[in-house]
Amino acid sequence: MPLHVLLLAPSRRAASETFIRANLRGLPFRKTAVFGDERPLGRPLAFAHGLAVLLSKALTVLGLLRLASLPAACTTWLLLQRHRPDVMLVDFGFHAVRVMEAAGWSGVPLVVHFRGSDASSESKFQRLRDRYRRLFQLTDGLIVKSRPMQQALQSLGADSESMVISPSGADPALFHRADPAAAPPRLLAVGRLVAKKGPLQTVQAFARLVARLDEPLRSRAELLIVGEGPLQDQLQELVDDQQLSGQVQLLGLRSPQQIADLMRSARGFVQHSVVAPDGDSEGNPVAVMEAQLSGLPVVATRHAGIPEVVLDGDTGLLVEEEDVEAMAQAMGRLLLEPELAARLGAAGRRRVANGFTVQHHWFAVSGVLERSAAARSPWTR
């Protein structure tokens, strides 16, 4: 009989959280998924769980963190009794603390998948640190995106033996066949328009680059930015102030297929990730891996897990966070040296294909779930 996994996640709707949907598609198990933002009238237990998650959120805002762990945990316990899974997989640490007590009450093994802000945002991390310590007493397995994330959780008592580092990975079926040497002088950025993604710094660097290029390259250089978010208006103002409206395009949201097509039309991929003012940082950006798997060279920062995937001078060019001048120079190298772009892109594709595809990620997650389920079974078969 195949392993039965109950997957709990805070949201099905977030457009940027395609990795949760990817796990639903790719993990080779029987899967039951329940999302905290859904309240389906035809499924009373899932409806009650959605209401309980809302109550848990409200109690968290009020600072009643211990009490906040009870409402959703109670409905999760009922879900466990109803579905009788072999193991529970919870996406995001902040969601796991809402439901974690159900694992202790039921004996169902608990695996938690940390993604990024749940292990880095200063306000969130500090507020939940005691709850995380309790969480680590109840977990059988932990999945993290990078070594810095692993170290952050270990500082709160997470067991390194139960932890696996596994970036979410890129899909080879979508991301392939870029030819940066033959592409126009076009740079591409993909990600939510939030502080940790550094879209403002990316545009500032591009503005510096354009100002020093000679014609005709100066007029031909382009920067395409895919994504939406709270910085969108500020970003558009910056583009207008720099008189770059003809060369910087804010494309909004695009489907994975459209992003893959854009990557096949670009010279390089750029992302100036930084630690945000609230302490939020990346895990290991999926778009960086998708770009490399496509065959694009990457210009990015030495931030979070990025240096674990992008090797400076081999598969891309890395600069320090907030060093806009170095970012401009690295972008310029890709536009001025198409042969360099091709060499870096080819090496990046090999690196991701050999260790950072979504299939590698599914294999790692499957291993954690199987080991956790094998350690103990809560149900009498």
Task: Describe each PLM feature range.
Residues 1-47:
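N-terminal subdomain of nucleotide-sugar transferases
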Residues 6, 143, 179-208, 224:
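Conserved donor-binding/catalytic core segment of Leloir-type glycosyltransferases
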Residues 90-96, 114:
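Short His-centered aromatic/hydrophobic patch
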Residues 148, 169:
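Carbohydrate-associated surface elements
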Residues 234-257:
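Nucleotide-activated donor-binding/catalytic signature segment of Leloir-type glycosyltransferases, i.e.
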Residues 264-279, 296:
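Acidic donor-binding loop of glycosyltransferase active sites
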Residues 288, 312-313, 317-324, 333-339, ...:
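Conserved acidic donor-binding segment of nucleotide-sugar-dependent glycosyltransferases
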Residues 288, 293, 297-300, 310:
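Short hydrophobic beta-strand element within catalytic cores of glycosyltransferases
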